Amino acid sequence: MTRSPLSFEKIENNASFEWAVFVHGAGGSTRTWRRQREDFGAQYNLLLIDLPDHGANAGKAAVSEEYTWDGLADTLWATVDAAGLKQVHLVGLSLGSILVMDMERMQPSRTLSMVLGGAIVKLTPQLRFIANTSLALAKLIGFRSFYKLAARIALPRKNHKKSRDVFVRESQALSIPAFKRWTELYTGLDDHLNMLFMRTTTTPRLLVMGGQDHLFGKQAALYAKRHRHTELDVAPGCGHVVSIEQPQFFNATALAFLKRITRSILQVEAA
């Protein structure tokens, strides 16, 4: 087994289960998924990965001096390889949903399906401006203040507080150089998302969105309408991070989708 570039937690519940790989969002860690472990673990083996500079990777040498979407996706696949896994389901949250789409783009034959929680698939003009000026704004007000501001913009309501608090608390583990590396990545986000938005794929995917996701909800609906092999489920009265704010909805919706995919795979193999 090769050495993994990233820290991960590997949970093999049953040798006959398929594997689901979990990729958290900006400022998070594998702890982000604690509300999913039990429900998903009853039906799947789990690989939970900490992104560079996050969780157990905080304080470690950077995997690269400058992050790129392709480079990060490669690093995630190298981690999957180090865990000894072949074909997997990919589950991504917020920024992790972008990385999951990039992973599938790079190795579609290994991707059984994608679950995209709080999917980021396209930017509004307002978000495009924020992304393009993110580095300058972060330098002006401080990187930690920038992340707190981003949390308040994305999760403004009282019922979003739990998700907002988790985001702010987890992001405290990031060093200032790490904040800078990730913030620099956002300056090219619009062009990258436009490429992903236009790309077609036959890999089944589910977008799980909050009904109160004022930043990304409408774009997710457009994406689901445009692409075949794509499902959209919306949690009423919920913000951007459905897996934290309404974990029962997220888990039930995602597992029902994965069950259908697994059944289809078994039918093809039996034919």
What is the role of each PLM region?
Residues 9-62:
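Conserved HGGG/HGGXW glycine-rich cap/lid loop of the alpha/beta-hydrolase fold
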Residues 38, 47-91, 252:
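Active-site loop/oxyanion-hole signature of alpha/beta-hydrolase fold enzymes
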Residues 92-96, 100:
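Gly/Ala-rich beta-loop-alpha elbow adjacent to hydrolase catalytic centers
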Residues 105-106, 111-141:
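Flexible "cap/lid" loop of the alpha/beta hydrolase fold
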Residues 125-127, 144-199:
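Conserved alpha/beta-hydrolase catalytic His-Asp/Glu region
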Residues 184-225:
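Conserved serine/cysteine hydrolase catalytic core
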Residues 225-241:
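Catalytic histidine neighborhood in serine/cysteine hydrolases
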Residues 238-251:
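Catalytic histidine-centered segment of alpha/beta-hydrolase-like enzymes
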